[in-house]
Each structure stands twice: as structure tokens, then as C-alpha cells.
Amino acid sequence: MNTKNFSPEAVPRCTPAEASAPPGQFPFTRGIHPTMYRGRLWSMRQYAGFGNAAESNRRYRYLLEQGGSGLSVAFDLPTQIGYDSDHPLARGEVGRVGVAIDSIEDMNVLFEGIRLDKVSTSMTINATAIILLALYVATARKQG
């Protein structure tokens, strides 16, 4: 593959710092991996999550077994806005359009048997982003 098209001379509107770094090096204007998609395909992921953590875990494992290389976690509405599943305002919404996550135990079950250091994960999160990210990081640390 011809990579000369992306040299600083070929892209004059970029600053030297933006255009001169090779792929995989700061400032990552040419990608985060040294060979990018020539050596590693993009992540294949399906937006999924429903019911409880165990049901969603079964779905994620199935998707990975079928060739998926990443996960896109769909959280239910109560989780996205910060309500526990037993909160009165969550009634009728728990697990309907995504997985219900109320605790670190739920997050551990969600990713049980899935090596987070081997699978890229995206999460559609709103106001509770910092809480769910903290639970995700704690789960990853528990896995080692």
C-alpha cells in the first residue's frame, strides 16, 4: 500500500506536528496503531444489552463467538439516568431497552468470561458516565 500520500508534503494544510508523526505515534493524527487497518481490522460490534447482566453476558459471548471483535453496551433508561432498578420511577423501564446495571456485582456479571483487555468496549452513557466508567474500570482491574 502506498503511504506516501500522507506525508507532510502531500498534506500541506496540516501543521508539521500533525502530519509528520507516523501511525501509532503522538499526536496520533494517522491512527493509534502502527499499521492501522492494514494490520488490524476495525472493531466489529453490535449494539446490545437487555434484561439483566446475566442475559446480556450470554448475548455478548454469543456475539464474540460469531466473530464480533468489540462490544457496544446498551444500558436501560433507569441506568442511564441514575436510578436503581427498584426505584419507583424505574417501574416498567428496567431492562427494556438495555441492560440494568445497579452495582459492581452487576458489572462483574455483565463481563464474566470476557477478557476486557482483549475486547474493545463502547458504552452509550449519559449523566451516569463517571459511575459506569468507574464500575467498568473496577471490573477490568478485578480481571487483572
What are these regions (language model features)?
Residues 1-143:
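Catalytic alpha/beta active-site cores
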